[in-house]
Amino acid sequence: MATKKRLGGFSKIHVAKLKADNTFETPIPVTGAKEVEAELSYEQVQFYADNAMDYSDFVFNGGEGTLTVSGLTMTEYNTLFGSTVEKGGVLVKSTDIAPELALLFERKKLGTQDRVLYALYACKFAPPTISAKTMEGGIEEETVELKFTVRELPAGEVFYMV
């Protein structure tokens, strides 16, 4: 029988802070998973000698992506962007330093009870755009798009899936 490999869904987002020793803290949930997209950039490298290509490879050159969620709590602002939670609100400063995080999530293998787990290492999130819409005869869902970058860890790890 063929192995099921079609995927669907997106759920159970967690983030884990990257520590100085390149290990991670305990993962923390981020609720309201809607969508994630990460584009990893690989630069083609080619060298020629004796009028012919004698080396060709692709080298990881970082990445970027977008995580879409239904909204953010004050704690999630603190976790993702390094913003300060104070006096019942969130204070975002130009001097905030967003921590590097592993972005963890799962997808279902269609037609099975199995799932695929993902860990994108060394992600850094930018605070979201502030936007609002008037209600014109109905309510439309408004989501929050979080842009992030991805880099490799010192041993070259970019992501893991199982």
Regions found by a protein language model. Give the residues of each.
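Structured, beta-strand-rich domain cores
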Residues: 55-121
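Mixed-charge, glycine-accented linear interaction segment located at domain edges/termini
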Residues: 125-162
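Short secondary-structure transition/capping segments
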Residues: 13, 115, 146-150
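Short amphipathic beta-strand/extended segments with alternating polar/hydrophobic composition
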Residues: 25-31, 116-123, 161-162
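Solvent-exposed edge beta-strands and adjacent loop segments
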Residues: 2-77, 125-140
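Short, functional N-terminal and low-complexity linear motifs
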Residues: 44, 114, 143-144
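Short, surface-exposed, charged/polar-biased interaction segments
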Residues: 9-10, 88, 141, 148
